[in-house]
Amino acid sequence: MSSYFPRRLSARALLLPLLASGALALRAQTAGSALPPPTVLSPLVVQGRATDLVGTAATASQGIVGAHELAARPFLRRGELLEVIPGVVITQHSGGGKANQYFLRGFNLDHGTDFSVNVDGMPVNLRSHGHGQGYADLNFLIPEMVRQVDYNKGPFHAEVGDFSAAGAAEFRQFDMLPENFVNVALGENRFARLVVAGSQRGNGMATTGAFEFTHDDGPWRLREDFNRYNGLVRRTWSSAAADFRLTAMAYRGTWRSTDQIPLRAVEAGTLDRFGNVDSSDGGESERASVSFDGTWKGATATTQLNAYAIHYRLNLFSNFTYFLDDPVDGDQFNQRDRRTLVGGALSHTWSALRPGGGASETTVGAQVRADFIGELGLHRSARQVRLATVRNDEVDEGSLGVFVKNETRWNAWLRSEAGARWDGYRFKVTSDDARNSGKRLDDIVSPKAGLVLGPWAKTEIYANAGFGFHSNDARGTTIRVDPADGVTPVDRVTPLARSRGVELGVRTAVLPELVSTVSLWALDLDSELVFVGDAGGTEPTDRTRRYGVELANFWRATSWLTLDADLTLTHARYREDAGAGTRIANSIATVATAGANLAQGDEGWFGGVRLRYFGPQPLIEDNSVRAPSSMTVNARLGWRTKTWEAALEVLNALDRDNYDIAYFYASRLPGEAASGVDDLHFHPAEPLTLRASVTWRF
């Protein structure tokens, strides 16, 4: 624990440096001269993966994806927006309103741990969350409003802190849409979707708004009755010297869940593949946010300020073991999360020419965040009626991160990037059991470094190394007794867990219209205790090592056809064998994706087809139980004019009986032994599904 992080620093006090620095930056930029007249905003065109990034990228595995690439893909669920990142797999084990399951680089990231997601500077990952640490629910995003996705992998970027060991993604939304539009979609299983969005310019400003409603019952025997409402309003002002945007977003979702089911019951014919054991599982969630972004531009320097306030609420009912713990009322449990989080970031970047040639760019920045969690509850329930409280907490969690990075071009063939960040955390837990209340402080320093050789023939070679971390649930940092019985002593978790990574890679655009990257990487995570949100206690995890190779290719074959193909191979193991084995459950060793998109321009045919494969995976440490591989093909075909567009989507076009996800653990059905049955539990992928849409652009 560092003495540099004041013991009396409250979460609210963490906001003061940001606000003061922002005021100084604004005064410095505006003192002595008025801002120039506003300029007219124009729609921004992003090339996406066709942009080779040679000469600008810091690692081989980072990249960008543009709006036109997102628009060409058929999506089953909102989290699949992240599948545009090579190697990322998105699945679901419950209802559509719950955050998806994320997989990358041999990690089962659960609902977001070790993968950082931001939207226009606002964090999506929720720390000390009621269901799981780093919970990242993307249901509040409207896909048509995303103009670009920036992504990177590994702990190599100083501006990214918590939850970024495996990687990070930043969604950037349109300031002004290329066209106003209305989209209506209908599909099987009572799927219906309406999106209305548009932009308007006037008085030197641009205003953009969007609304979405989605209903889906899914193929489940229990109608999912998933209703999603999304809204967005953005006001943007731009001049030669500064850009400002103010954004408000809102989301609400309600659903009924078909959670994972036991394979034994399906094979015995007593449970349908799309059936359920507990028909009362489900939930509701809401999110509302306001954010501000400002950029002040000088001849050789840029200052950026971001601030946000977010309200969030989740009420979730789940039952994964059925009647194992309670043979009468069942094992359903209720997780509740109600919070407000505020924060922001300030950075200043300046560039200079080096004596003798070359250039250097330095960025210093600070990031602050405070989560005020008024309710963090875990309760036993039956048919959504609360029976008992396992634990109920209030949590204040604050953090301050400071970073610096420098990129220098030493000569025509050598670039370097070096940086470091310091993060300090304060945890305060007020529990219904005073023995589990308390305060903790912790901090961590994470250095990063990288070299880039080239370009030669539009080819660069990268070498990167860095340290990263993720925070753990605040409740685990102060726990002393197991809330399940109120007696058993429990060890407290490490507040901040260390990760270490290296990567070697090549990026080339030597062949016309073809961008290819290959990266070799390794990532170590320390052993730690982690808080288990489903149980309210802690459990140990051993040290892990993951390494692998990634290949990504994007080819603009003609003016109307693009092809892409990506392959990821990963080796993931525990570094010590404690007797159970060294395999990491749900670590996917092989991920392959490929796609073809065609578009004849503003008018004519358009469409695409995508294949996603992920290989078999261990479900327990000794590798004696494995989940099968999964292959999914989605397709889209349509016709457009300058004002109208019609399209047909086919999801799971081969109608394969895939598992979306599988686990191995003990559960109990009525009539089974009290000790339960060890079994594979799975959530099936949705079968072949048709959806049609019509879009009017104006």
PLM features per residue range, with description:
Residues 62, 79, 83-126:
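Extracytoplasmic beta-strand/coil segments of soluble accessory domains associated
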Residues 123-153, 171-172, 266, 493, ...:
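Short acidic/polar hinge/loop motifs at secondary-structure boundaries
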Residues 150-158, 167-200, 211, 216-220, ...:
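Short strand-turn segments of transmembrane beta-barrel domains in outer membranes
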Residues 186-215, 220-258, 281-302, 350, ...:
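Transmembrane beta-barrel wall of Gram-negative outer-membrane proteins
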Residues 243-251, 283-432, 454, 514-520, ...:
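Face-selective signature of the C-terminal outer-membrane beta-barrel domain
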Residues 293, 298, 302-320, 454-470, ...:
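Membrane-embedded beta-barrel scaffold of Gram-negative outer-membrane proteins
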Residues 347-353, 416, 517-525, 539-621, ...:
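Gram-negative outer-membrane beta-barrel transporters
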Residues 613-620, 639-698:
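C-terminal beta-signal and adjacent terminal beta-strands/loops
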